[in-house]
């Protein structure tokens, strides 16, 4: 369980590993979105191919950064992620979002690769979000750390915070709620295959967040499902309703959920 998620949602510095000068690609979008939405912290690009990306100095490797970033975004192919995560551990990075796919959701070798990531994260006490996720938003503070059409949109900050194991579902709910439903969002985070920081970790944080009044969650499965009653009691005591979509209750739904996040620990 992570108790310092304020640092994740409000990072003082962010490093983008694999940052690209092609701003339409997945690896090129996050840096531009952070800039265009007014993120006020320090930005670092890491890619040995470029001297700079979007006006931001580019460093050849994580070890070359002048400071330890609060948050690292990993946008490289699956085969390179384990080495990148080790470098983050050596640098003392507290939080890493792994966007890369090609892990347990693919089966076979991907299962072993994902297990290796979990072991590295545990060894170095890194709060990993992902892999195979779409990123996160902290609307009020301009932390638009992700990719996809919703990240090109400006949103008014609100008091709804949501965590979703599906990026497509979560950001669709956020967009519809904020634009058409009259319930603007404060924070949105996607956890993908969820090897580290869990859906329930984020729900627990939202309960403690004084600016969140309504909590949303999309859950395909949870390895820490035993915490749900406690989470419910905390939310009730705090007067914060939880709206949860729990999928995978039928055999067909379980297969669909497994193919997406490889999360077989149904709650």
Placement of each model-derived feature along the sequence:
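Catalytic-core regions of core metabolic enzymes
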Residues: 1-267
């Amino acid at each position: 369980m992570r108790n310092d998620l304020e640092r994740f949602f409000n990072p003082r510095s962010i490093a983008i590993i694999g940052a690209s000068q092609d701003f339409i690609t997945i690896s090129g979008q996050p840096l531009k979105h952070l800039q265009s939405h007014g993120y006020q912290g320090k930005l670092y690009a890491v890619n040995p191919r470029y001297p700079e990306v979007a006006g931001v100095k580019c460093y050849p490797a994580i070890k070359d950064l002048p400071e330890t970033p609060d948050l690292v975004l990993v946008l490289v192919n699956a085969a390179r992620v384990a080495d990148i995560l080790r470098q983050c551990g050596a640098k003392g990075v507290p939080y890493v979002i792994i966007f890369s796919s090609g892990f347990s959701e693919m089966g076979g070798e991907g299962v072993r690769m994902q297990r290796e990531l979990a072991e590295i994260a545990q060894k170095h006490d890194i709060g990993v979000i992902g892999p195979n996720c779409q990123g996160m938003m902290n609307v009020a503070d301009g932390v638009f750390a992700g990719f996809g059409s919703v990240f090109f949109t400006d949103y008014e900050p609100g008091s709804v915070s949501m965590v979703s194991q599906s990026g497509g579902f979560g950001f669709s709910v956020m967009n519809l709620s904020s634009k058409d439903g009259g319930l603007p969002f404060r924070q949105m985070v996607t956890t993908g295959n969820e090897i580290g920081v869990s859906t329930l970790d984020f729900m627990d944080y939202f309960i403690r967040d004084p600016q969140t009044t309504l909590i949303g969650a999309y859950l395909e499965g949870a390895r820490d499902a035993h915490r749900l009653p406690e989470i419910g009691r905390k939310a009730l005591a705090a007067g914060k309703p939880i709206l949860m979509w729990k999928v995978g209750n039928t055999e067909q739904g379980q297969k669909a959920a497994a193919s997406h996040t490889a999360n077989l620990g149904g709650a």
